[in-house]
């Protein structure tokens, strides 16, 4: 009975501790504005606009870059106070690799709200070439946007969150971080490097209560992806792509945003240092069971 009582008491302590931890997670690092604050570093393409809408519906204030047409007004109508940091573009040359770019976004969050709770960054530059045709110039461009920009983002996001003692970061990379495409040798190389960088950053930040994860997408249903592979004008290429995906279809951006939101909503505070592919099962394709 003593053992059972001890286990019960231990369980009660753990339950109380978990409840206290959850309550703590839902507080905000922001000192102004009365709401939790999220940074969406690229609200123009891919996941970003969808994630920003989800944050607004969760009663967050927002700091965003390069918003899609009409997005800022939409977020405000949903009740968010929105700061748009100017000077960023997604239609090459991308701006995230500029020294100090990510820091400007963080500074905007600190100036307006006195802190932030969640940060998402998408950095991307597709260079199409295999190992026999890639150039030093193409490799360097890919390094700047797909790897160096991730370092700058993490170096900007982490210090204020670590000082506050709580927060979450998601870096969008690519499913090719784990399963390469030989026709995108530079892209895959530096996406893989970025995924490892995120895992290293997570270990650095974990003792301070910060969660850092990478989400790697592929086969997303947006024009840029289809154009890169020539599938926007060639139905046969699109069909060939679909045949590579176990789920047999392209992924929707809002599906990926939903997954990212679960890593950034202030409640999932025991998941860190991971690379999550969001690619319809592609990363496990070929791993057949008997």
Where are these regions (language model features)?
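Catalytic Tyr-X3-Lys loop
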Residues: 125, 132-151, 170, 194, ...
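Canonical Rossmann dinucleotide-binding motif of NAD(H)/NADP(H)-dependent dehydrogenases/reductases
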Residues: 25-63
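Conserved mid-core segment of classical short-chain dehydrogenase/reductases
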Residues: 90-103, 111, 118, 124-140, ...
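Alpha-helical segment proximal to the catalytic Tyr-Lys
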Residues: 159, 203-204, 269
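Short C-terminal tail/terminal secondary-structure segment
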Residues: 272-290
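Short, small/polar-rich loop/turn modules that mediate ligand/substrate recognition or access, typified
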Residues: 206, 211, 271-273
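A short, exposed helix-loop element centered on a Lys and neighboring polar residues
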Residues: 154-155, 199
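Catalytic loop of short-chain dehydrogenase/reductase
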Residues: 168-193, 198-207, 219-220
């Amino acid at each position: 009975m003593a053992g059972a009582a001890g286990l019960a008491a231990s369980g009660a302590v753990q339950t109380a501790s978990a409840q206290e931890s959850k309550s703590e997670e839902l507080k905000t690092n922001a000192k102004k504005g009365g709401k939790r604050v999220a940074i969406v570093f690229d609200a123009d393409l891919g996941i970003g606009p969808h994630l920003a809408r989800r944050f607004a519906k969760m009663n967050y204030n927002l700091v965003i870059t390069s918003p899609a047409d009409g997005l800022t007004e939409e977020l405000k109508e949903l009740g968010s106070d929105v700061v748009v940091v100017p000077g960023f573009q997604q239609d090459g040359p991308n701006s995230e690799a500029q020294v100090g770019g990510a820091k400007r976004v963080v500074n905007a969050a600190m100036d307006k709200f006195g802190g932030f709770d969640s940060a998402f960054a998408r950095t991307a530059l597709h260079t199409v070439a295999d190992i026999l045709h890639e150039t030093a110039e193409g490799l360097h461009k890919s390094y700047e946007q797909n790897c160096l920009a991730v370092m700058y983002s993490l170096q900007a996001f982490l210090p204020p969150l670590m000082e506050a003692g709580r927060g979450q970061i998601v870096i969008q990379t690519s499913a090719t971080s784990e399963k390469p495409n030989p026709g995108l040798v530079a892209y895959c190389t530096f996406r893989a490097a970025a995924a490892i960088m995120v895992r290293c950053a997570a270990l650095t930040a974990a003792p301070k209560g910060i969660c850092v994860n990478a989400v790697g997408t592929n086969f997303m249903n947006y024009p840029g992806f289809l154009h890169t592979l020539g599938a926007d004008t060639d139905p046969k290429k699109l069909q060939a792509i679909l045949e590579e995906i176990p789920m047999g279809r392209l992924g929707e951006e809002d599906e990926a945003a939903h997954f990212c939101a679960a890593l950034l909503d202030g409640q999932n505070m025991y998941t860190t240092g991971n690379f999550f592919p969001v690619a319809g099962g592609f990363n496990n394709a070929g791993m057949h069971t008997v």
